[in-house]
């Protein structure tokens, strides 16, 4: 199971016990093509799910993506790289 935190308040990230300040990259970086999804996913050994974390910087991608063509397909195309790795992908 993969949980994708798409909220700039990072509630799913914080609720998973992850300090967003300690992250090298987040879903924002993936959406803006500054990091790969595979290197950004935080693997869980105990909780039964992996996490694509968010930070407050996610508001940056909201502003940047609004003017992009085919923006509604960006996340879909990103998920192609990992879709076979997970039975379920949940988005918050």
Where are these regions (language model features)?
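P-loop NTP-binding core
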Residues: 1-91
């Amino acid at each position: 199971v993969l949980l994708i935190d798409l909220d700039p308040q990072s509630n799913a990230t914080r609720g998973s016990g992850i300090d967003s300040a300690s992250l090298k990259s987040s879903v924002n970086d993936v959406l803006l093509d500054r990091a790969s999804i595979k290197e950004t996913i935080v693997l869980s050994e105990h909780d039964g799910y992996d996490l694509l974390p968010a930070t407050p910087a996610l508001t940056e991608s909201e502003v940047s993506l609004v003017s992009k063509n085919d923006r509604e397909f960006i996340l879909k195309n990103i998920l192609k790289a990992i879709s076979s790795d997970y039975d379920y992908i949940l988005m918050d």
